[in-house]
Amino acid sequence: MLRRDMNIADYDPELWQAIQGENRRQEEHIELIASENYASPRVMEAQGSQFTNKYAEGYPGKRYYGGCEYADIVEQLAIERAKELFGADYANVQPHSGSQANAAVYGALLMPGDTILGMSLAHGGHLTHGASVSFSGKVYHAEQYGITAEGVIDYDALRKQAHEVKPKMIVGGFSAYSQIVDWAKMREIADEVGAYLFVDMAHVAGLIAAGVYPSPLPHAHVVTTTTHKTLAGPRGGLILSNAKDEEIYKKLQNAVFPREQGGPLVHIIAAKAVCFKEALEPEYKVYQQQVVKNAKAMVEVFKQRGYNVVSNGTENHLFLVDLVSHGLTGKAADAALGKANITVNKNAVPNDPQKPFITSGIRVGTPSVTRRGFKEAEVRELAGWMCDVLDNIGKDNEAAVIEATKVKVLDICKRLPVYP
């Protein structure tokens, strides 16, 4: 029999220890992985609700199971809030992840073997934009575009490539690109070759919702995003469109269910609804503005300390530090900073001489630190600490510098907790 007072701590101490350990890690480490963020307690409350128990195949008002009246309310709330937040005419809140949202879009609008043109993973794209190891590069004929030596998209080169390969779909969006994308220019190129423009805005969705980064919705046929990352919601996916095309909407609905997925995760959809409501609040815009301010402030410190920043700056929440001129690898930098309780991820840089598991750069993102209250003064100090660690990798005093930095990190984490 079930009881309300059941808990993990008494029943499964090994698992509870891991959960508590992760809680301590998040509180005591500075999180700079650009794709991570801290969900609010309200979002986590929804994820732990009784909707965990509910099967609800189908869509609101058209379910294959009974007892879905409250599931319908939850999903419709999420749909309407997503549409309001992004200025969309269509929203599907059921995708379990960003990758599954992308798979549904491909499945809705393409046939196996059709040509897609997406940003290369090595130049800042995503696995699902046509990488050879992904379904997107196996099911479809994937061509890849890149960035210039200066770290920006060359739209003239993209136009030339599009005319040469004649894709059925051009894929916009990125996982490691720090500049503004000209969505109107991408739509213009897509129209010239008769292609769909599909944008994966997962990394900048929160910035777009707050109006601090240009929205692709007025230009793309279809847009997807995750609901975590800059949006700071539960881990999940979302499909949006403002194409005013009922045929596309019908194809997207059928591609999510029953093509790609069965029953939706109603508890996660409930958490998405909370997340979208939070993103509609005035303070959310202030938060996203600070995310960009913090990223720009950190970039300036790295440049002042002699580190190369890809594209020489940032216009969003992330930037890449190119370590080639310092003779460092991304793997070594990631490990050293990790010992100081600063979490980043190794990342390839343009024309990277290292293998993907080694890399020559690190990706730095500010959504999480901003969420816990860091402003320009704190992130400038943090960037300086990071440079101290990087400057001393492989030197006699490396361990001492790391330990001294860790003490500073623990102090500021105590002053600015994730969940006070």
UniProtKB/Swiss-Prot annotation:
Enzyme Commission number(s) from the entry: 2.1.2.1
Record-listed (6S)-5,6,7,8-tetrahydrofolate binding positions: L121, G125, H126, L127
Positions bearing the site annotation: Plays an important role in substrate specificity: H228
GO biological process assignments: glycine biosynthetic process from serine; tetrahydrofolate interconversion
GO molecular function: glycine hydroxymethyltransferase activity; pyridoxal phosphate binding
Pfam assignment, any one: SHMT
Cofactors named for this entry: pyridoxal 5'-phosphate
Catalytic activity, reaction form: (6R)-5,10-methylene-5,6,7,8-tetrahydrofolate + glycine + H2O = (6S)-5,6,7,8-tetrahydrofolate + L-serine
Sequence intervals crossing the membrane: none
Sequence positions bearing N6-(pyridoxal phosphate)lysine: K229
Broad class of enzyme this protein falls into: transferase
Domain of life: Bacteria
Family: Belongs to the SHMT family.
Subunit structure as annotated in this protein's UniProt entry: Homodimer.
Protein's name according to its UniProt entry: Serine hydroxymethyltransferase
Source organism per UniProt: Glaesserella parasuis serovar 5 (strain SH0165)
